């Protein structure tokens, strides 16, 4: 309040006869006034009394992990929505700075745990570009990478549709989705030895070749999966309850997607056919025939349709991969960069098979020294930086990788699509109903392991 003003009902104190004038030579005089409390009370008095703040999560079955949603609501209407993240922070990016370039694969595969092959591929493509060996990657290794990534896309979308349907009251798609996903995880286990967190894709190629029954397992899956996907599609696509809960819900048009940096099925549901497999191909994707499905619904139902069509396109790509597979190496030949991947592991799983010992120790002393340094110190990557992106089931998964010329990364940063796409929660949910928040978040399909890292 200024010095010349008086509050109502108060008298101004008499001024002294000779007020002391401040010495302003060399100093700045600042007149500080108090808070305008009248304006504050008027603003608060005009607010609606029934507006409350509700925490949805982080322990909630419909938030896809430990996502916390802070909702300010008036009755059933969401006035403001904010995301609270960080509950699954694991410090993976920092840990990579203390591990060799080869060991990093074991860490990054655990970030977005529903699409581990994409984490591994993006990391390995970055290391290979820094090493300048992108053109030396064996063709068989690139084909197997594409095959595994597309199977992983199907398994990830199955989880999205299964959990999204369950959250809206459709229990049967939940059972069907996880039943079909189990078939894909069985194939992963046959090929890599693990259902999740595989660390199978390595800089320079693959950890080892496909097992003898690997191709047969994939072909059995391809024979069964189209019918299973149709059964699941019939449960949801024309379901009147599912359509009522998803159509015109979670609306986000192309302008909003571009402003927020949204990618993946959310962006393609707004009508833009942006797919890195087409615009910036990697692993030979430019040689495969597939379509990029789009819709113009800009809502949860449109994102559901996109994922259904993407699973069909992934099956087409997997079939092409099987037709292209030819015998050959799955790791570059440079022994200074990678140890043999064509040899089977020993019973202890540590590679101590007679074939390994004969190849490494029985060839030459120089080869033994190189292998010892490769295992203990790791490879040295030339100094530089690179950004590599792949099209994951949730959108653009990018890696910014910096090397100082040593055996460990100087910095590895992941641009996870779940983290970016969660910015759209406010735009999708504000002005809608509380029940529609569940459908909107499910249509984004965030994985908190990738968000928090």
Curated annotation (Swiss-Prot):
Residues 1-21 have a biased composition (Basic and acidic residues). It catalyses: a quinone + NADH + 5 H(+)(in) = a quinol + NAD(+) + 4 H(+)(out). Keywords: Cell membrane, Membrane, NAD, Quinone, Translocase, Transport. Residues 1-30 are annotated as: Disordered. SUPFAM superfamilies: HydB/Nqo4-like. Pfam families: Complex1_49kDa (PF00346). It is a peripheral membrane protein. HAMAP family: NDH1_NuoD. Belongs to the complex I 49 kDa subunit family. This is NADH-quinone oxidoreductase subunit D. It comes from Nocardia farcinica (strain IFM 10152). The lineage of its organism: Bacteria, Bacillati, Actinomycetota, Actinomycetes, Mycobacteriales. The gene is nuoD.
